[in-house]
UniProtKB/Swiss-Prot annotation:
This is NAD-dependent protein deacetylase. Transmembrane segments: none annotated. Binds 1 zinc ion per subunit. One of its GO terms (molecular function) is histone deacetylase activity, NAD-dependent. It is found in: Cytoplasm. NCBIfam families: PRK00481.1-1 (NF001752). Its EC number is 2.3.1.286. Its cofactor is Zn(2+). Keywords: Cytoplasm, Metal-binding, NAD, Transferase, Zinc. It catalyses: N(6)-acetyl-L-lysyl-[protein] + NAD(+) + H2O = 2''-O-acetyl-ADP-D-ribose + nicotinamide + L-lysyl-[protein]. The active site is at residue 123.
Length: 243
């Protein structure tokens, strides 16, 4: 492990076009449940009696807008979450002009909360909301502080700005993410199993020098990586910052 940390530190220190790609494992230490792991959010949602895929779908929003927004308020609004040391480390490298930014599969908005400026949120964010009918925009504080569920303009359901099952990923976001990956000299994957498509397929566009994967479990890209560390991200970053 010590040798891996030394290698990681050397690669990071010698890179000036790092792109980060993050998944659910990065936010677990902030209290955000992993969607798919045992005991994660999907397991909790299943207790509501409907499939997680349906409850997080465009179909459910259209079939039962009231049920959809009540579900979002009950299960998705992570009110007390704060960025952890991994989010802070990524933001610091961007401020130091070593990083092109971060691409994330997460919807918690914690990269932006940590100060990262160049964030491509592939699946949207819970930091923004809008009316499903008239598309009026709302902030997270509008929804949480005022417990606002219906648009004050037209009465429509206020939904989070996330990509639901049955919806397409935002193409401008995909293009920006591809640009970050194609121009990176180092791509650091953190806390992602790299199996959720089409987002995970972006990794195949990396042509730079160093692919680094830090994840508790194996990924389909491990054999292509310069360095693989199967460990907790928070522990790795803490150790890295004390080297």
């Amino acid at each position: 492990m010590k040798h891996d940390l030394e290698t990681l530190k050397h690669i990071i220190d010698s890179s000036n076009r790092i792109t980060f790609f993050t998944g659910a494992g990065v936010s677990v230490a902030s209290g955000v449940p992993d969607f798919r792991s045992m005991g994660g959010l999907f397991d909790e949602i299943s207790k509501d009696g409907l499939s997680p895929e349906y409850l997080l779908s465009r179909d459910y929003l259209e079939d039962d807008p009231e049920g959809f927004i009540n579900f979002c308020h009950k299960r998705l609004l992570f009110v007390d979450t704060m960025p952890n040391i991994v989010h802070d480390w990524i933001a610091k490298l961007e401020r130091n002009q070593q990083s092109l930014g971060v691409i994330t599969q997460n919807i918690d908005g914690l990269h932006s909360d940590a100060g990262s400026q160049h964030v491509d949120e592939l699946h949207g964010t819970l930091n923004r909301f809008y009316c499903n009918v008239c598309h009026k925009s709302y902030t997270k504080s509008d929804v949480i502080d005022r417990t606002l569920k219906h648009c004050d303009n037209c009465g429509g359901a206020i939904r989070p700005d996330i990509v639901l099952y049955g919806e397409m990923l935002d193409q401008p976001t995909i293009i920006r993410a591809l640009n970050k990956i194609e121009h990176a000299d180092t791509l650091v994957v953190l806390g992602s199993s790299l199996v959720v498509q089409p987002a995970a397929g972006l990794i195949s566009h990396f042509k730079g020098d160093n692919l680094i994967i830090i994840n508790k479990d194996r990924t389909p890209y491990d054999s292509d990586a310069t360095l693989v560390i199967h460990d907790d991200m928070v522990s790795v970053v803490k150790s890295l910052m004390t080297e």
